[in-house]
């Protein structure tokens, strides 16, 4: 009986720990089966209220929404007139898998526990096709969002839903266009991606009462099968009951439909379309296998209910994963869109105006009627103002947009007239004094420079007698909703306002929306029922800006070369070909299909092959095998000559002049015979049809010769100056352009003395990064020129060209400098392999200015070389010095240092600095964290109390061959089971304390040799364990026998709080022939209720014990411990602490 109680208590503890580790406890994670009879709820006749409205599709339009605000559920038995588009009724789950991808991960709900798990579409399709009698559990998919997949084109929502959905009409549309990720990963989401869902349920699935996230409304089409709904209206009393029901945690015991006064059960059949308004509480049952398409949407005609549902989600702590994304950001954009569409004033940033509204004032150089600076005035004077300076381009554009402008002007005049009538009627009835109405209108009038452009003379100005057009009046639902929305956003604390990036000035936006609500507080309802939505995006074709210069993008393998008449102008003789822009992009070459690499098969082992789908990979790299990379790729057949426009007319055995050749410098492809110039080219052996054309080759030769002459002249001048002044300093030569080597080695100029030392060869000179030395040379040259020309006299043209041109002065030798051996900070001097010796004695007379310049230059070079690691000859020693410094930093400080530069980042990832990595108690291990662990190759890895999965752990251990110590305390067996594979490294420490779900069977799987690969090592992967921690596990003597057999080197064993262990367990560990008898040095038996004084008699056999932990063992007395110490005092001295901790002294 006591053993059964222990097992029951352990089971409770496991359940509590699993719920504690989950990220929040929601209504989707409540464990335990329901206690009410669902079959009785399906047969009961008390759910007979009547809330449903049956309609035809043609009646569900914008005018219907404006009249009723979409408050009641609607059923359409036929889809005609709705504007929806659906696949054929025989569309199956396998078809869904084909369109969204078999690897797509979907959230699956366990109907029995109402807890969510994850499956791939391939796994779900296999489960769905399994016969009903073979299904062990009931699973339900209710959240497969398939926008931006191939399935998206097969499903179209009702037309009216498209007209009122905030995502389509409110959210900046350029953000939606940027969405590329098909899944609902919040990090990659550019807009609220909740518009199209696929729901797949098997017979018997049940989803408990809930309200759709964020108070969204739902459209729902039954493609196959059927559904049963229980509907509860969103009254104040019902919503309060629903909130208390969620917080009670008794969803499995209470059927919410029995607690409310009114509830309706309705059955939906195949082909039905169902619309659930905002806030309606509903439960769903699936009487047969069903495939449903639907979606969620927010709209402007029930904003108060949407806000209330979102507040309920706040109070019930619904996890972010199950909530409407970007909710408050969407609310801000709602206010902005209403202000823009009603007042023609935009509060978006310039970028958002350009991308979503197609407004680009900076490029056009003029105002557009729909820009933020357009007037929102409704007075007729604002319409009659015009500018006399409108050019012809403005009039052309206005003629193009005349119809739309005329309609907008008529709406403005009609609205003004209606407001005047309202004011007169209200004054006559003496209900309210509207004297301030005119003042508000005057406030809205903008300066003449910001008013709309006057229509062209061909378009008459709107008059009061003009026929009425679509009225921009607001319905009562919109006015009340916007007022609630403003109050909600103003009441939010600053950190929860969630102001989006596209809003420029939120205070001005709030001010304008309040004025808008004041102006439209008494709009006549009959004029607001127009059947036309107020919030609409302007058509991009009408507002497309053509003034930005177009940039031509060309693909190298598809680009046709320019014709002969459109070739680039010839280069000047003074400009080398290597410094000019290439005449065209280099063409992408194709396989020759003749070499050995092209004809052989894939190896199947390289990283490219492993990525291929035919070898089981994801197919993302889209690269060919490493062994199949062509050795001589040829030009594609589509390439033509840039001069004559003809293709290659020859093969390898015919005339060379008709063979297409590609230049390695300018990338131009021509026939050699088409070049009308005399000269010689340079053939290349690297690729077929590859050469250096005569234009580039001849130009390069002339450039080299010119450079050579200039260097000689410059050297002669320097030598003459040296001889006259008897000064000794290194010569400065002009560096040729990048990619060209100097024609002759640099010479060290010495004064004519018979005792002077021979010049040092170039290989002995200290190499300096060219870019940094060029910059310093420029700075010094400019400083000297300022000193030489204090009155601002002009420099010579040659000096200016020398500073700006491609030829820059570079010092090839530096004077020696004493090294400091006591420097602590690692600098260049400390890491140079051999100290630099002076080439010759120092000169007797040296210019002081030159000495200061060289010292400053040397210090700058040393600092740059040390920080950026630019000295190749001392890189390894430099790294070792910095690593010795990095060893004193914590991991947090080291991560900060890694942001300094690329060299520090590379050195900071050295595995010697990361031998121990501790990520314990991290809420989530993202892929970037796992990649960082792999990059650092730790020896000790602590993953305790994390939610690491089996897949993640397998990925880690496969890439950490040097891992020795692994800490998995507090994890689950599903993750720890990854160690049972043959790829597990040879660990020396394994910590499995308080791991959920581990018993004797699981320990056997870990310790026995892996059998997942045939012919593998028959020994256990944990045979080198020296430290094993099994505290808090339900293990017995079976586990101890496995440890004795498979862990011969075990020295530390932690068996604390294992309730099934007894004195016989200790006897096994110290029995004759047991490997642990001679290897154990530390044994922990704290909290083991079955251990008594008899265990100490068995522990005397272990000759190497240094620590015995018995605290919490109630059946072990202190007297027995003292007796144990006294009996062993002859050979070994022990001491006893107050907590029954026996430690070895000598």
From Swiss-Prot:
Q: Under the cellular component aspect of Gene Ontology, which terms does the record hold?
A: nucleoplasm
**Residue ranges of domain F-box in the record:** 874-919
- Domain-level remarks: The JmjC domain mediates demethylation activity and is required for satellite silencing.
Query: This protein's superkingdom?
Result: Eukaryota
Q: Where is the composition biased (Pro residues)?
A: 453-467, 739-762
Query: Where is this protein found?
Result: Nucleus, Nucleoplasm
**Name of the protein described by the UniProt record:** Lysine-specific demethylase 2A
The segment annotated Disordered runs over 363-467, 554-585, 733-800, 832-867
Q: What family name appears in the similarity comment?
A: Belongs to the JHDM1 histone demethylase family.
Q: Where is the composition biased (Basic and acidic residues)?
A: 402-442, 772-789
Q: Which reaction does it catalyse?
A: N(6),N(6)-dimethyl-L-lysyl(36)-[histone H3] + 2 2-oxoglutarate + 2 O2 = L-lysyl(36)-[histone H3] + 2 formaldehyde + 2 succinate + 2 CO2
Q: Which GO terms describe its molecular function?
A: DNA binding; histone H3K36me/H3K36me2 demethylase activity; zinc ion binding
Q: What is its main location?
A: nucleus
- The EC number on file is 1.14.11.27
Briefly state the protein's biological role: Histone demethylase that specifically demethylates 'Lys-36' of histone H3, thereby playing a central role in histone code. Preferentially demethylates dimethylated H3 'Lys-36' residue while it has weak or no activity for mono- and tri-methylated H3 'Lys-36'. May also recognize and bind to some phosphorylated proteins and promote their ubiquitination and degradation. Required to maintain the heterochromatic state. Associates with centromeres and represses transcription of small non-coding RNAs that are encoded by the clusters of satellite repeats at the centromere.
Domain JmjC span(s) in chain numbering: 146-314
Q: Where does substrate bind?
A: 207, 227
Ranges of Low complexity composition bias in the record: 373-387, 566-584
Q: Where are the LRR repeats?
A: 945-966, 968-994, 1032-1057, 1058-1087, 1088-1112, 1113-1138
For Zn(2+) 2, which residues are the binding ones? 603, 606, 609, 625
Q: Which cofactor does it need?
A: Fe(2+)
Q: By which gene is this protein encoded?
A: kdm2a
Biased-composition ranges, Acidic residues, are 388-401, 849-864
Please tell me where Zn(2+) 1 binds in this chain: 592, 595, 598, 630
Cofactor info, note text: Binds 1 Fe(2+) ion per subunit.
